Amino acid sequence: MSLRSERVGEQLKKEISEIINQKLKNPNVGFVTVTEVEVTGDLSLASVYVTVLGEEKERKKSLEGLEKSKGFIKSEIAHRMDLRIVPDLKFKYDESIDYGNKIERMIAELNRDK
């Protein structure tokens, strides 16, 4: 990933987080945290990794809500950032938090068994 795409990714992360938490009025989108944004080298696609507070049902509902709100989020980004072309957004669930929690539970169980 180039330096420019990394910088754009970091700025997108900040802006998308702010838009979701302050501007987005979709009731299907619950407590969402943007954990990472990866932008392609040509800045045409941004993979937005999010975590959602809640169970599988809330996670699916929030991801669907984000997909439906993609146009609004892109228009807000266009107003906030000086980009010739706003990247297409692809929302993905970040499973690294769940994986970390699973490892932590396994370690705690091992320590308890000693």
From Swiss-Prot:
Quaternary structure note = Monomer. Binds 30S ribosomal subunits, but not 50S ribosomal subunits or 70S ribosomes.
Q: Which GO terms describe its cellular component?
A: cytosol
Briefly state the protein's biological role. One of several proteins that assist in the late maturation steps of the functional core of the 30S ribosomal subunit. Associates with free 30S ribosomal subunits (but not with 30S subunits that are part of 70S ribosomes or polysomes). Required for efficient processing of 16S rRNA. May interact with the 5'-terminal helix region of 16S rRNA.
- State where it is primarily located: cytoplasm
What protein family is recorded?
A: Belongs to the RbfA family.
Keyword set, alphabetical order: Cytoplasm, Ribosome biogenesis
> Tell me, which GO biological process terms does this entry list?
maturation of SSU-rRNA
> Which Pfam family, any one of them, does this sequence belong to?
RBFA
Q: Name one GO molecular function term.
A: ribosomal small subunit binding
What name goes with this protein? Ribosome-binding factor A
**InterPro entries (UniProt xref):** KH_dom-like_a/b, RbfA, RbfA_dom_sf, Ribosome-bd_factorA_CS
What is the protein's species of origin? Answer: Macrococcus caseolyticus (strain JCSC5402) (Macrococcoides caseolyticum)
Question: Mind telling me which PANTHER family this protein's record contains?
Answer: RIBOSOME-BINDING FACTOR A, CHLOROPLASTIC-RELATED
Compartments annotated for it: namely: Cytoplasm
